[in-house]
């Protein structure tokens, strides 16, 4: 088995554990803190719900890619999808954490059947356009890491953040601007 596929599996496992530990360490008061100002003003629980819904969607897209499809539909409005999906999810912090762990386990099971050559299969992403299946898998752990950084930044500043990449990269991703 190739080094890249092993690396991706390890990062998915390790970053999944870090994400779960991060959310487990939060107090109940923290769970009600608003993190983003855009859209519905996601709170901590909404961010974890977003991880769950996004990863579930990626699992469908990844399977589609393996079957010769392109992944995410070209016309997917990612912001609308995220808002709609998060709005349908509810649960206690413990329930959301358990669901997150199960979804990550499902992703790890998916990777168990991959071959090295699968990583280069062409794939579409609604925000990043044409990529490859391996890139999608890496995005699963990078995505969560970026949001955890946002949560820490919001906690440190004591204020919610705009949902942009400006505080990280200088690139504004807010669809309203």
Positions of PLM-derived features:
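An N-terminal domain-cap segment
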Residues: 13, 17, 21-25, 29-36
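Structural signal for well-ordered, non-membrane alpha-helices
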Residues: 16-24, 55-59, 63, 101-115, ...
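Short, contiguous alpha-helical
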Residues: 32-79, 122-177
């Amino acid at each position: 088995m190739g080094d890249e596929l092993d690396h991706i599996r390890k990062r998915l496992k390790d970053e999944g554990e870090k994400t779960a530990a991060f959310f487990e360490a939060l107090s109940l008061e923290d769970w009600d803190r608003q993190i983003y100002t855009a859209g519905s003003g996601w709170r901590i629980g909404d961010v974890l719900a977003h991880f769950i819904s996004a990863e579930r969607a990626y699992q469908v897209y990844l399977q589609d890619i393996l079957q010769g499809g392109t992944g995410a539909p070209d016309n997917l409005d990612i912001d609308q999808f995220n808002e709609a999906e998060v709005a349908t999810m509810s649960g206690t912090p413990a329930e959301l954490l358990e669901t997150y762990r199960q979804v990550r386990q499902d992703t790890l099971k998916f990777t168990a059947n991959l071959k090295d050559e699968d990583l280069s299969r062409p794939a579409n992403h609604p925000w990043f356009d044409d990529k490859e299946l391996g890139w999608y898998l890496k995005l699963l752990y990078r995505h969560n890491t970026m949001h955890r950084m946002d949560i820490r930044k919001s906690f440190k500043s004591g204020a919610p953040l705009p949902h942009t990449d400006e505080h990280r990269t200088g690139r504004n991703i807010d669809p309203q601007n």
